[in-house]
Swiss-Prot record:
It holds the Pfam family MTS. It is an enzyme of class 2 (transferase). Transmembrane segments: none annotated. PANTHER family: RIBOSOMAL RNA SMALL SUBUNIT METHYLTRANSFERASE C. Its EC number is 2.1.1.172. CDD domains: AdoMet_MTases (cd02440). The gene is rsmC. Keywords: Cytoplasm, Methyltransferase, rRNA processing, S-adenosyl-L-methionine, Transferase. The lineage of its organism: Bacteria, Pseudomonadati, Pseudomonadota, Gammaproteobacteria, Enterobacterales. It comes from the Bacteria. It is found in: Cytoplasm. GO terms for molecular function: 16S rRNA (guanine(1207)-N(2))-methyltransferase activity. This is Ribosomal RNA small subunit methyltransferase C. It catalyses: guanosine(1207) in 16S rRNA + S-adenosyl-L-methionine = N(2)-methylguanosine(1207) in 16S rRNA + S-adenosyl-L-homocysteine + H(+).
Length: 343
C-alpha cells in the first residue's frame, strides 16, 4: 500500500495557492489529478472539470458527489483526455511516482493543453523542470512559504512505456516487480521480513492481505503453504498491478482487488495479515492501523487471527484497547513489533 491519504482543508497549502490564482484557469476544461486536497471534493471552484485519480479511497469519496466527473485509472484503460484545455497536478513526495503518473497523463492529452503543477518544496516541486526538461517548459508563477505553483507549456508529448518504470528484484527465490509509490519498491523492507519470519508453522484456510503492495507477504506465505487461498487488497492502482503480476510471475493463484481497508471485503478469513502504512507523506498518521485492528473481528472467522507488523516507536496503548482485544507480541526488534490479535 502506498503511504497516502487524502489531505484536509486545514493543511492544504496547495489549495490556498490555487485559490489565489483562480483567475488563471477557472473557465477552461480541466483535468485535476495527483494527491488532490479534500476541499476540492466539496467546493467546485472550477466549473468544467474531471478528476483523474490513482487511489481507490479517493475515487470512492469523489464518486459519492461527482459520479460523472471522475476517472479511476488502473493502467488497463486508455481514456480520452485530449479535449481538455488544462491539467492541474498535485505533487506527491515521491519523485518517481509523480513522474510515472504525470508521464502517463501527458501521453494522453493534447499538445495545446496547459499544465499546472502545485506542491511543496519537500515533495521536490523545484526539481520538476529538470525531470520533464525534454517535454515541458516550466515557469514558476507563484509561491507561498514552502509551496509553489508552476505553469508549463508542452514542447512534445512523451510516449508512455510502463516497463521503463518497473524495478525488479529477487528475495528468497521470489521475483518481485514493483512500480514507484508502491511500498517495497526497491527491496523488501525489514518490517515485512520480520512479519514473514513469524510464520514458521503450517497455515491453512483463507488469508486476507490488507495493503498488499508488491504482494510479497502473501507470496511468501503461499510458497510455504500452497493450499491456502489468498486475497490481496490495496487502494493504489500501481500496487494492484504489482500484486497481480507478481502472483503470475511466481506461479501462484489468488484474488486481487481494490478495497479501502475492509470497504469491499464481504467474507470472513482465517488470517488477516498487514504491514500497514503509518505515514501520510512525511507525517505520521495511524488512522489506517487503528481501523484495521478495530474492524478485524467482523472479518475474521471464529478463532481467526490478525497478524500485523508496526514500528516499535508506536505505543500499543494508543492503538489497542487492552480490555477488549486479546493480543500478544510475537516478535520484536529495535525497529519493528509483530502483533497477533485473535478473535
Amino acid at each position: 500500500m502506498n503511504k497516502t491519504v487524502i489531505k484536509t482543508f486545514q493543511i492544504s497549502k496547495e489549495y490556498k495557492i490555487l485559490k489565489k490564482n483562480f483567475q488563471l484557469f477557472k473557465n477552461k476544461t480541466t483535468i485535476i489529478s495527483g494527491i488532490i486536497p479534500s476541499v476540492f471534493l466539496k467546493i467546485n471552484i472550477i466549473k468544467r472539470f474531471i478528476f483523474y485519480v490513482n487511489y481507490f479511497n479517493l475515487y470512492l469519496k469523489i464518486l459519492k458527489k461527482n459520479s460523472k466527473n471522475v476517472i479511476f485509472n488502473n493502467f488497463n484503460h486508455k481514456n480520452k483526455l485530449s479535449s481538455y484545455k488544462q491539467l492541474i497536478f498535485f505533487l506527491t513526495k515521491n519523485k518517481k511516482e509523480f513522474k510515472l503518473h504525470l508521464t502517463f497523463l501527458l501521453s494522453h492529452i493534447s499538445k495545446t493543453c496547459v499544465i499546472y503543477v502545485v506542491g511543496e518544496k519537500k515533495c521536490g516541486i523545484n526539481s520538476i523542470s529538470k525531470i520533464f526538461s525534454n517535454y515541458l517548459i516550466f515557469k514558476k508563477i507563484d509561491y507561498a512559504r514552502t509551496c509553489s505553483l508552476y505553469k508549463a507549456k508542452i514542447m512534445k508529448l512523451p510516449k508512455f512505456y510502463l516497463h521503463k518504470f518497473i524495478n525488479i528484484y529477487i528475495w528468497n527465490n521470489i521475483t518481485i516487480q514493483s512500480l514507484p509509490g508502491v511500498f517495497g519498491y526497491k527491496k523488501i523492507d525489514t518490517g515485512s521480513k520480520l512479519l514473514i519470519s513469524t510464520f514458521n508453522k503450517k497455515i491453512n484456510g483463507k488469508i486476507l492481505d490488507i495493503g498488499s503492495g508488491t504482494g510479497i507477504l502473501s507470496i511468501a506465505l503461499a510458497k510455504k503453504n500452497p493450499l491456502i487461498k489468498i486475497t490481496l487488497t490495496d487502494i493504489y492502482d500501481a500496487a494492484i498491478w504489482c500484486s497481480k503480476n507478481n502472483l503470475i510471475k511466481n506461479n501462484l493463484i489468488g484474488k486481487v482487488l481494490f478495497s479501502d481497508i475492509y470497504s469491499h471485503i464481504k467474507k470472513r478469513y482465517d488470517l488477516i495479515i498487514s504491514n500497514p502504512p503509518i505515514h501520510y507523506n512525511l507525517k505520521i498518521n495511524l488512522k489506517i492501523l487503528k481501523k484495521i485492528i478495530k474492524n478485524s473481528k467482523k472479518h475474521l472467522k471464529k478463532k481467526g487471527e490478525l497478524r500485523i507488523v508496526i514500528s516499535s516507536f508506536i505505543s500499543l496503548k494508543y492503538i489497542i484497547n487492552f480490555n477488549k482485544i486479546n493480543f500478544k507480541i510475537l516478535l520484536k526488534n529495535k525497529s519493528y513489533t509483530v502483533i497477533q490479535i485473535t478473535n
